[in-house]
Amino acid sequence: MPQRKISFYRLLPLATLLLAACSTTPPSGPATSPTSPQWRQHEQQLRQLSQFQTRGAFAYLSEKQKVYARFFWQQTAPERYRLLLTNPLGSTELELVVQPGVTQLTDNQGKRHVSNDPQEMIQKLTGMSIPLESLRQWILGLPGDTTDFTLDDKYRLKQLTYQQDGVTWVVDYQEYNTQVTPALPSRMELSQGGQRIKLKMDNWTVK
């Protein structure tokens, strides 16, 4: 039986105002070297964050659809995480639970879908292309599998470019939360072709 695509028609642009600032100019200041000891120290601190959670505003923009939602990301281990998207009324639109070897997605009708590839399942069910495997690193301010990145004047990621299977993602870090240690992204934008993903992290809890 073919999988039915999840309809996001109920996701109203409540997050539009919150995400509008995501188009602001990235942090200014002289670029710093990715080989600098300050970056290596910051990177090491980020890699030590085995458990974290963050919530905020999510927007997916493409020629075919525009999706606005609230999101909650909870990472409990390097290969275990939960992603929740809710509409402005607080109702669950999508819940993704990823564990080693198996992914379960629950849609807004309560139907469960199981796969071993979370990124492919999201694509088939929602039409959204989200690089989940890399996003687990990027959302923390880590470059993941790419070495093509630049730093800001505080030795944090400013921009990265990631290429895989002929697809190129560019991630711009527009603001950081300095109320947590180490500093973590509070605004970022991912772009690939004609699609963009905007994330605004309201708060972080780390361990």
Swiss-Prot record:
Q: Where is the lipid attached (S-diacylglycerol cysteine)?
A: 22
Q: Which regions form coiled coils?
A: none
Q: Where does the signal sequence lie?
A: 1-21
Q: Which domain of life is it from?
A: Bacteria
Stated membrane topology is: Lipid-anchor
**Do the record's keywords include Protein transport?**
yes
Cellular localization per UniProt: Cell outer membrane
Subunit (UniProt): Monomer.
Q: Which family does it belong to?
A: Belongs to the LolB family.
Question: What name has this protein been given in UniProt?
Answer: Outer-membrane lipoprotein LolB
Q: Corresponding gene?
A: lolB
